Amino acid sequence: VRELGGPLHYQRSWSRLFNTFSRIIHPRRIFVNPAFKELSSFMQALPVFFKNEGTTIYKGRNELKLFERGGRELIVKSYQVPHLINRIAYNSFRASKARRSYRYAEMLRQIGVGTPKPVGFYSTGTWLLFGSSYFVSLKSECPYTYRDFATHTFEHQEEILRAIARTTATLHEHGILHKDYSAGN
């Protein structure tokens, strides 16, 4: 095999420097739960997959999409890009919402609160400003949202509501306040 020569050779010799500079200007943080190593390539290209694939299940301030990878159903939440002050804070001082969602899911599972298993998170930015972020988890087995309880009657509804109350009590016993019983959750 012949080595590259000519103009392409000179461009290749700069690629390491270019990539280093690009990572400084456009940082990204990707974390994959070790239990889901096989999803690393999906996580590496998450913004592209999110833009072009998946089934949208909710679109508002944030967007949720359903993906199937490796026989697993995944939920990917894309968070709205924050306003300027928070873009600076998330880039420099505070963990992104995606990273906090991952951490909170791990904490809840440790205290025995059922929550979908977290797969990972992905965050991007540009130099001093935070950009977009994504949180990935397995799909929840629970088919209901709080809105469903307000608008419909279900079989075993009282049992489900009591389970929600027990979960809330468990959270309080561990010093955790839920703070978001909004209808879409």
Where would I find each of the regions flagged by the language model?
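Juxta-kinase regulatory segment immediately upstream of eukaryotic protein kinase catalytic domains
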Residues: 2-54
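Conserved ATP-binding subdomain of kinase catalytic cores across diverse folds
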Residues: 7, 39-146, 163-174
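AlphaC helix of the protein kinase catalytic domain
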Residues: 145-154
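Short alpha-helical scaffold element within the canonical Hanks-type protein kinase domain
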Residues: 157-161
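Catalytic-loop of the protein kinase fold
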Residues: 176-183
